[in-house]
Amino acid sequence: IPIINYNDPVSDEENRKHEIFSLREARGKAIECVDNDETASQIACLVRCRTLLILTTTDGIYLDPADPSSLVERVSGKDVYELIENVDELQSHCRGTSRKGSQGAWAKLEYVKEPLTRGTTVIIGSSRHSIASLLSGEAKATRIGL
């Protein structure tokens, strides 16, 4: 199980800028992943994983973060188009972040769209739970997929 944590510094700012510039020059495009969720989503696409587990400080995505009973436990659709429409609808309820420095639920949902279109199931859940309980469905979480 790959564990992605891009925020740990491995190069200084100037090296990072140079790396991105070099990639854009060579390939015409470069994705700059400066968020763990974005990085994990890109890697999920590259390795064609079946399940992407995004760990966070909450049990998943809420319609109202102030109301624990508003946890969205499942997002699905009859096809990938309807699934993405349902994710878009859920994003419309996302405002703010759970802590300073994070990009919040809206960004998590934005980043997982590409893996979802490739058939990956996404689970967004709390790091307080074991990976096994999140994957098995024993722990509360938001599960997104067809």
Residue ranges and their predicted role:
Residues 1-146:
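C-terminal catalytic "cap/lid" subdomain
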